[in-house]
Amino acid sequence: MSAVRIGQYTLRNNLILAPMAGVTDQPFRTLCQRLGAGMVVSEMVSSDMSLWNSRKSSLRRIHEGDPEPRSVQIAGGDAQMMAAAAKANVEAGAQIIDINMGCPAKKVCNKAAGSALLRDEALVSEILHAVVSAVDVPVTLKIRTGWDRANKNGLNVAKIAEQAGIQALAVHGRTRADLYTGEAEYDTIGAIKQAVSIPVFANGDITSPEKARAVLETTGVDGLLIGRAAQGRPWIFREIEHYLRTGEHLPAPQLDEVERILLEHLAALHAFYGDVMGVRIARKHVGWYLATRPGGKEFRARFNALEDTQAQCANVRAFFSERRQSLETEDGQGVAA
């Protein structure tokens, strides 16, 4: 894998944790970077700075100790507000500004932001030029292939982005209308890569080392954005990086390591958000970690009723202890047979 540069920053590999609202908070970003991500991107931050005073918004902003280069994603539909938000985030420590024109959520699109912007190429150009002019750090862009299948203008938007001075482009291989259904359009991503000279990253359905290599080979992109596949599996980055580098699979993490990672993640969530909010946010992450494990579904129902940090950690330890005992019993029966 050749090194990928975004402006003055050389990434340690070409695998990026995709920004996901409600998921890629500081604890998760830090964990994914430690487990192999070449770069991580913050949760989406509104360009409406009047909303930044809420506790929720302040937690979404960049923090000391965030992995570098610190990339912050902003969203909005007004060029001057976007420029001001970019400037404020850079003053707060952001080293890269990422512009969201890919989010398909109704509450974002209804405000003429996210992927709704793809319907107005003139506004796209205005926003990109305004943000690039406002800051002296690299500006990147995330898009979809278009608004719907009858209006797939990702190629045009990519060219507009390059002309505006965007330093790298991430493309989710679906239209806004597709949401997350159907197959990702890797052919469209490949065409976009061929049309511009800036680094292009593919996003969508990259769930395994083999899929990662196939997408890189078929599209010719410079790197990959991995989002949903990292939920409950933050070690996917080191698995893909190792496979791309050596052609061999890393062994899956042992039960003890999964337990250590999950407990580390819980402790970070509790410390970052405080006990009440931390307990609440931890529930979905634990659900993702244990979704495919025997007894995970039943455990999640019990775990979601827990109301304090110590009980959460104790119950996770008990779950893994029971799993180890179960595996030892199964191994013993296998030997006896």
Curated annotation (Swiss-Prot):
Q: Does the keyword Membrane apply?
A: no
The record's function comment reads:
Catalyzes the synthesis of 5,6-dihydrouridine (D), a modified base found in the D-loop of most tRNAs, via the reduction of the C5-C6 double bond in target uridines.
Annotated catalytic residues: 103
Q: Which family does it belong to?
A: Belongs to the Dus family. DusB subfamily.
Q: Coding gene?
A: dusB
Q: Which reaction does it catalyse?
A: a 5,6-dihydrouridine in tRNA + NAD(+) = a uridine in tRNA + NADH + H(+); a 5,6-dihydrouridine in tRNA + NADP(+) = a uridine in tRNA + NADPH + H(+)
Which ranges of the sequence are coiled-coil? none
State the name under which the record lists this protein: tRNA-dihydrouridine synthase B
Q: Pfam families this protein is in?
A: Dus
Cofactor annotation: FMN
State the organism's lineage: Bacteria, Pseudomonadati, Pseudomonadota, Gammaproteobacteria, Pseudomonadales
Q: Tell me which Gene3D superfamilies the record gives.
A: Aldolase class I, Putative flavin oxidoreducatase, domain 2
Record's keyword terms, sorted: Flavoprotein, FMN, NADP, Oxidoreductase, RNA-binding, tRNA processing, tRNA-binding
InterPro entries, alphabetized: Aldolase_TIM, DUS-like_FMN-bd, DUS_fam, DusB, DusB-like, tRNA-dHydroUridine_Synthase_C, tRNA_hU_synthase_CS
- Binding annotation for FMN: 19-21, 73, 142, 203-205, 227-228
EC category name: oxidoreductase
